[in-house]
């Protein structure tokens, strides 16, 4: 830095000797390759340990199923063993890889991403009738005055004495149902014997030792408890619910999914496929730049400037090496 000795006069000293070669930090790595599971589009995911990698991308791949493309997990493990602090991983997959899925009644459940790992996903549904509403007075046909409407919303399915109904409107404590109840639901006792219950259900999503539990889920699309909203942040599955029609019968929501007379049950996803290894080529690893959030392969690292060193483990295809070198430069 320049030193000022008097107005208009200063002296700056600098080293004229050749600079020595400086090492490049390798604490943060970037990896591209095939994995058991994990997203194949979007920004690479951060892994702060090999355990973290296994949770997001699965374990080691078999030589029998993945051949020369099986080395991603091995390389990430060695990276951490040899002092790596963190890495970012972008999973790639053959174009014909398929996500496991299952359509059950009005519900379609799909694994979060491609691969036969999804064939081990179990979905369990359990009918729950916990929340209660006491009706104090009948005002009109299918219109009642409730003691409290807390926990109930317009569009919710309800149950009374084995009969199912749907709340059409709620105004103050006045509740209008879509249909009239066959039995009288009014009860003015302090401790009521007759109550209307919210028809909800619990959902458990299981993949190996990873379990996600969602309590008091409903099929009411306008409710925060809607199954689509509740499972929106699931790391294991994505769900879609068929839109309701006027011809649909009102009934137990679990029966609408699993079938008539089934109020509790479990099903397994199927059809997941890792893809054909013979269809893996240079383009699989180089990837496609479809814009933010949709990039694949090496191109996905355009959304990441934190890595110090990059690798495509086990791949020595000249086009891939050239693309990787160009990206690093």
Positions of predicted regions on the chain:
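Surface-exposed assembly/interface segments
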Residues: 1-329
């Amino acid at each position: 830095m320049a030193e000022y000795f008097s107005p208009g006069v200063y002296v700056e000293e600098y080293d004229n000797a050749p600079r020595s070669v400086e090492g490049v930090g390798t604490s943060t790595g970037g990896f591209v390759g095939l994995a058991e599971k994990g997203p194949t589009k979007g920004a690479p995911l951060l892994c702060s340990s090999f355990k973290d990698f296994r949770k997001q991308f699965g374990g080691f791949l078999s030589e029998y199923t993945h051949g020369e493309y099986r080395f991603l997990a091995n390389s990430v493990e060695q990276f951490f063993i040899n002092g790596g602090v963190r890495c970012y991983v972008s999973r790639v997959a053959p174009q014909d890889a398929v996500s496991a899925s299952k359509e059950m009644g009005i519900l379609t459940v799909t694994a979060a991403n491609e691969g036969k790992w999804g064939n081990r996903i179990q979905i369990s549904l359990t009918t729950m009738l916990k929340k209660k509403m006491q009706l104090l007075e009948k005002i009109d046909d299918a219109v009642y005055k409730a003691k409290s409407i807390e926990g109930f919303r317009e569009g919710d399915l309800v149950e009374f004495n084995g009969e199912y109904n749907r709340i059409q409107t709620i105004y103050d404590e006045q509740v209008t149902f879509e249909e009239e109840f066959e039995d009288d639901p009014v009860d003015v006792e302090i401790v009521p014997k007759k109550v209307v219950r919210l028809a909800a259900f619990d959902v458990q999503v299981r993949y190996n030792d990873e379990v996600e539990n969602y309590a008091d889920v409903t099929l009411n699309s306008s409710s925060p408890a809607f199954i689509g909203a509740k499972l929106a942040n699931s790391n294991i599955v994505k769900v879609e619910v068929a839109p309701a029609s006027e011809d649909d019968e009102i009934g137990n929501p679990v029966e609408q999914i699993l079938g008539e007379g089934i109020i509790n049950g479990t099903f397994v996803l199927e059809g997941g496929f890792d893809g054909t290894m013979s269809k893996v080529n240079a383009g699989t690893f180089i990837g496609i730049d479809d814009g933010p959030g949709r990039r694949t392969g090496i191109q996905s690292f355009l959304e990441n400037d934190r890595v110090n060193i990059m690798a495509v483990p086990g791949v020595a295809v000249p086009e891939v090496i050239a693309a990787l070198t160009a990206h690093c430069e």
